[in-house]
C-alpha cells in the first residue's frame, strides 16, 4: 500500500497547480478588499471575515475569588497582524479578565477595551492597564450584576516598525500607522492600528461566549476611552453582537470637520496633544484623497450610507471631557444631532482627556443598569436660538431630571478651554422646570470666548448634558498664548 507520505508528495504538485492551497488571513483579507472594488468602507468587514477562519486561541490562567465576584483570567492570542509587513511582534496577545458577580444577569455582558504595555523595551517594562482598573471592574460588576470583561493591551505595544526600527506605543503608533497608510492606501488598507484593535474586541467576544455558556451571553455593551473608544465604535460597526456602546473622550466623529474646526479655533495651529500626528505629517494631509480614504475606514459617520450604517442606531452614551487636551468642547456640533437611534451625551466638567477616568465607573454603572433593566434612555433635545447679546438654549426632557446645573467657562483672550491653559468651569444651579421644557439664556462675553452647557441628573443617577456652546462662534486670527509647557500649540511646517 502506498504510504500517506508518498501519496502526499505525489499529489502536492497537482494541488499547487490547481490553486488548492490555504491562503493566510492577510491574503484572504486583501482578496476581499480587492473583490469589493477597493471599497475602504469594507476594510473592517474584510479583516474580520478573514480572521474568522482562524481557530480561537486562548489559555485559562487562573481564577480569583473576591467578595461577591469571581475573576477568571485568560491569555488570548487575537491575531497575527504585521501592518502589511511593517510592525512586529506580529502575534497580538491580551490578558482577558472576566468578572462574574453573584447572581449575574444572563444574556448581556460589559466589554471593556483596556490599555497596558505587553512588549517591553530597554527602559520601559511591561505595565498593567490603567484605563479601567480591577477596582472599577469589581465595582461595576457588583452594582450592575453584569459580567464585566476587561481586555488589556489594546493595542499591543511597544510595536517596532521596520521602516525605521523605532518602537512605538499609543498615539505614536497610531500616527505612524496612518502615515504608512496615506503613502499607499490601495496597497496597505489594513495598516491603520485601529483595525487590529477592533479585531481584538471581536476575538474577546468569541472567548467570552465560549467561556460563559451558563449565562448565555448573546450581546455586549462595549466601552473604552480615547483610541480604545475609537476601537469600540469600529467594533460596533463590524460586529452585530455589540448592542450598545459607551465611548469616552473620543470626540472626533465627522473627523474632517472636527479637525478643520480645531485648526481654526486655535488660530491655524494644533494642540500639543496632536504632537504625534503633527510629527508624522498627518495634520498636513487633511485635504488629500489619501486622508479621505483613511476616513472611510476610521470615521463612524461616513458609514451612514453603507451596509453598516444601521449599526449607528444602537444605544450610545458618549462621554466627553469639557477641558480635553485633544478635542474642542463643542465638537459634538458636527455629529450628535445627526446620529440615529437612542443616544446620550455627557460632558464631564473640568476634566482633561486623562482625567476622564474619574467619571468612568459612575457612567458605566448608570448606563449598564438602564440597559439591563430595559428602560428607555433619557432624551435631552436642545436647540440654540440666537438673540441679541447671545443666544437662548431651549431644552426638552423625556423624563424629569432631579438636578440641573449650568457649567460655564470664560477665556478672556483665546478660544481655548484646555485644562492646562488655566480654564475652569463654574457651576450654577438651575431651578427645576414645571414641565418638560427649559430655556436658559447664554450671554456672549464682551471679551474673549465662553463655553457653556447644561447638565441634568436623572433619578437613577444617570447624568446627561447638552452639547457645549461656544460664544461668540467666531475664530481668532492668532494662536493661543502659552501659559505653561502643556498649554502649547503646534504650527504646520514648524
Regions found by a protein language model. Give the residues of each.
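Surface beta-strand/loop "capping" patches
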Residues: 367-408, 427-441
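Short beta-strand element of the alpha/beta-hydrolase
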Residues: 95, 106-117
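Hydrolase active-site cap/lid region
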Residues: 234-284, 346-349, 355-358
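Cap/lid segment of the alpha/beta-hydrolase catalytic domain
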Residues: 119-129, 141, 145-199, 254, ...
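Gly/Ser-rich "nucleophile elbow"/oxyanion-hole loop immediately N-terminal to the catalytic nucleophile
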Residues: 183-226, 242
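Serine-hydrolase catalytic core
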Residues: 289-349, 397-404, 413
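Glycine-rich nucleophile elbow surrounding the catalytic serine of serine-hydrolase chemistry
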Residues: 224-234
Amino acid at each position: 500500500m502506498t504510504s500517506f507520505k508518498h501519496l502526499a508528495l505525489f499529489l502536492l504538485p497537482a494541488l499547487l497547480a490547481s490553486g488548492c492551497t490555504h491562503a493566510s488571513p492577510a491574503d484572504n483579507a486583501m482578496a476581499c478588499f480587492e473583490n469589493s472594488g477597493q471599497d475602504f468602507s469594507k476594510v473592517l468587514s474584510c479583516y474580520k471575515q478573514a480572521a474568522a477562519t482562524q481557530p480561537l486561541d486562548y489559555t485559562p490562567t487562573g481564577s480569583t475569588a473576591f467578595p461577591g465576584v469571581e475573576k477568571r483570567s485568560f491569555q488570548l492570542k487575537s491575531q497575527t497582524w504585521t501592518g502589511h509587513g511593517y510592525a512586529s511582534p506580529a502575534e497580538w496577545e491580551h490578558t482577558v479578565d472576566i468578572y462574574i458577580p453573584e447572581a449575574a444577569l444572563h444574556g448581556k455582558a460589559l466589554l471593556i477595551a483596556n490599555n497596558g504595555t505587553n512588549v517591553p523595551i530597554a527602559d520601559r517594562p511591561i505595565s498593567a492597564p490603567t484605563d479601567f482598573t480591577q477596582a472599577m471592574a469589581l465595582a461595576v460588576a457588583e452594582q450592575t450584576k453584569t459580567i464585566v470583561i476587561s481586555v488589556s493591551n489594546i493595542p499591543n505595544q511597544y510595536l517596532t516598525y521596520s521602516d525605521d526600527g523605532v518602537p512605538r506605543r499609543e498615539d505614536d503608533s497610531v500616527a505612524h500607522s496612518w502615515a504608512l497608510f496615506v503613502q499607499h492606501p490601495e496597497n496597505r488598507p489594513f495598516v491603520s492600528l485601529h483595525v487590529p484593535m477592533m479585531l481584538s474586541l471581536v476575538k474577546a467576544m468569541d472567548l467570552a461566549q465560549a467561556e460563559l455558556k451558563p449565562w448565555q451571553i448573546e450581546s455586549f455593551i462595549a466601552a473604552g476611552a480615547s483610541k480604545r473608544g475609537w476601537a469600540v465604535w469600529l467594533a460596533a460597526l463590524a460586529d452585530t453582537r455589540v448592542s450598545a456602546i459607551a465611548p469616552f473622550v473620543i470626540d472626533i466623529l465627522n473627523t474632517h470637520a472636527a479637525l478643520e474646526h480645531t485648526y481654526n479655533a486655535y488660530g491655524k495651529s494644533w494642540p500639543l496633544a496632536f504632537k504625534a500626528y503633527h510629527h508624522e505629517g498627518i495634520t498636513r494631509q487633511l485635504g488629500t484623497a489619501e486622508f479621505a480614504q483613511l476616513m472611510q475606514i476610521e470615521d463612524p459617520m461616513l458609514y451612514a450610507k453603507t451596509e453598516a450604517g444601521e449599526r449607528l442606531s444602537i444605544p450610545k452614551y458618549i462621554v466627553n471631557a469639557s477641558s480635553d487636551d485633544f478635542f474642542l468642547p463643542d465638537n459634538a456640533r458636527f455629529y450628535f444631532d445627526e446620529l440615529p437611534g437612542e443616544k446620550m451625551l455627557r460632558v464631564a466638567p473640568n476634566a482633561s482627556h486623562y482625567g476622564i477616568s474619574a467619571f468612568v465607573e459612575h457612567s458605566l454603572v448608570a448606563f449598564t443598569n438602564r440597559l439591563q433593566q430595559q428602560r428607555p434612555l433619557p432624551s435631552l433635545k436642545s436647540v440654540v436660538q440666537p438673540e441679541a447679546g447671545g443666544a437662548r438654549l431651549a431644552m426638552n426632557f423625556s423624563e424629569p431630571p432631579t438636578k440641573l446645573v449650568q457649567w460655564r467657562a470664560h477665556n478672556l483672550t483665546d478660544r481655548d478651554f484646555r485644562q492646562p491653559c488655566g480654564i475652569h468651569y463654574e457651576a450654577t444651579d438651575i431651578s427645576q422646570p414645571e414641565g418638560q421644557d427649559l430655556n436658559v439664556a447664554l450671554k456672549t462675553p464682551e471679551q474673549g470666548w465662553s463655553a457653556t452647557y447644561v447638565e441634568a441628573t436623572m433619578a437613577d443617577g444617570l447624568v446627561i448634558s447638552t452639547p457645549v456652546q461656544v460664544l461668540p462662534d467666531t475664530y481668532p486670527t492668532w494662536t493661543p498664548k502659552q501659559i505653561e509647557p502643556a498649554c502649547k500649540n503646534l504650527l504646520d511646517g514648524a
